[in-house]
A protein has these predicted regions:
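Extracytoplasmic metal-acquisition and chelation regions
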Residues: 2-327
Length: 327
C-alpha cells in the first residue's frame, strides 16, 4: 500500500513565496487590465480555469485554451488561440501536461506567466501503486508493462489537482500571483483564496473520513491520473494505461490486472468521461467486474457527474466508497 505523504508546514507556507517566483518576467510592473476593467487570464484547461475564476471572481475575465469535451493531453493550439494567448494579461498553465500549450506559452511573449507545476512538488507515479516510487527515491519502473510516460520532467505526474491538499498549494500561489499582477485588487484575491482554501480543506477531510475504512484499498482505472489522490488517502491505484489516457495496455498488463483484481478483491473497473471506455469494459467483462466513472476532472461536460470541481470530486468520492466497500 502507498505510504500517505506528510506535507511539512513549511512546504505549505512556501506556496505563497512560490506564487511570487512563478509569476515570471514581470519586470516589476503590474499587468494592467483590458478595456472592460478586468484582468484577462488565459488558462490552459479546466482545473486552472476554475482556480482563476474562484480567486479572481468579478475582477477577472477567464478564457481557456481547452474547450469542454476536448481531451487536454491531445490539444492542438489554433492560430486564433495563439493570438488570444499573446493578448492576455496573465497566462495560467501546468507545464508538462499539454506539450502544445507549453510551446505556445514559450513563444507568446506574455510577461505574466504562472506555471502551476512550480507551485507544488510533482512526483513520479507508475501504473501500479504497489511498486510506486515515493518522494526522494531514485529510479522508477518506467515503461512498466509497455507504458511510456512522457509527462513533466523525468516522467513526473502532472495530475496535482486531484489531491485537494496539493491543489490548495497551487491555489495559494495563484492568489499571490494574481495579486502581484493586479495589486489594486490584491486584498480581494487574498480573501477569495482563503475562502477557496477553506473549501479544499473541508473536501480533504471528507475524503479522509470517507475512505478511512474500506474492504479493499485497490482500485483499477483506465487512466493513471489518480496517483496523488491514492497516495494522499492510502490507496493503491492500478492503471490500465499510464498517465496518458490514449496509451494502449499490453496483453501482459491486462493479464496482470486480472490477477490483481482477484488477489485484492477489486469489484470495479473505472473509466473516465473524456476518453474511450472500451478497454475498461473489456477488462471488466473478462474478470466479471462492474464499471463506473472516476473522473480525472480535466474538463466539465454534460456527461460529468457534477457542474464544477467540488461536485465532481464528491461524486468521485461516492464512487470510490462504493467500489472499495466503504464501512
Amino acid at each position: 500500500m502507498n505510504v500517505r505523504r506528510l506535507i511539512p508546514a513549511a512546504a505549505l507556507a512556501g506556496a505563497v513565496a512560490l506564487g511570487a517566483t512563478a509569476l515570471t518576467a514581470c519586470s516589476g510592473a503590474s499587468a494592467g487590465t483590458g478595456t472592460d476593467g478586468k484582468l484577462h487570464v488565459m488558462s490552459s484547461f479546466y482545473p486552472m480555469q476554475f482556480l482563476a475564476e474562484q480567486i479572481g471572481k468579478d475582477h477577472v475575465k477567464v478564457d481557456t485554451l481547452t474547450k469542454p469535451g476536448v481531451e487536454p493531453h491531445d490539444l492542438e493550439i489554433t492560430p486564433k488561440q495563439t493570438g488570444q494567448l499573446g493578448e492576455s494579461d496573465v497566462v495560467l498553465y501546468l507545464k508538462g501536461l499539454q506539450p502544445a500549450v507549453d510551446k505556445a506559452v514559450a513563444q507568446s511573449g506574455v510577461k505574466n506567466v504562472v506555471d502551476a507545476a512550480k507551485l507544488t512538488k510533482l512526483e513520479v507515479h507508475g501504473s501500479s501503486g504497489h511498486d510506486h516510487a515515493h518522494e526522494g527515491e531514485e529510479g522508477h519502473a518506467e515503461g512498466e508493462a509497455g507504458h511510456d510516460h512522457s509527462h513533466g520532467e523525468a516522467g513526473e505526474d502532472p495530475h496535482i489537482w486531484l489531491d485537494p491538499v496539493k491543489y490548495a498549494e497551487v491555489a495559494k500561489g495563484v492568489g499571490t500571483a494574481l495579486g502581484k499582477a493586479d495589486p489594486d485588487h490584491a486584498a480581494d484575491y487574498r480573501k477569495n483564496t482563503d475562502e477557496l482554501l477553506g473549501r479544499l480543506t473541508a473536501l480533504d477531510t471528507e475524503f479522509k473520513d470517507g475512505l478511512k475504512n474500506t474492504a479493499t484499498r485497490t482500485f483499477i482505472t483506465t487512466h493513471s491520473a489518480f496517483g496523488y489522490l491514492a497516495e494522499r488517502y492510502g490507496l493503491d491505484q492500478e492503471g490500465i494505461s499510464g498517465v496518458d489516457p490514449e496509451s494502449e495496455p499490453s496483453p501482459a498488463r491486462m493479464k496482470e490486472l486480472q490477477a490483481v483484481a482477484r488477489k485484492d478483491n477489486v469489484s470495479t473497473v473505472f473509466f473516465e468521461t473524456l476518453a474511450s471506455d472500451k478497454t475498461a469494459k473489456t477488462l471488466a467483462t473478462d474478470t466479471g467486474l462492474k464499471t463506473d466513472v472516476l473522473d480525472p476532472l480535466e474538463g466539465i461536460t454534460d456527461r460529468s457527474q457534477g457542474a464544477d470541481y467540488f461536485e465532481v470530486m464528491r461524486s468521485n468520492l461516492k464512487n470510490l466508497q462504493k467500489a472499495l466497500g466503504s464501512k
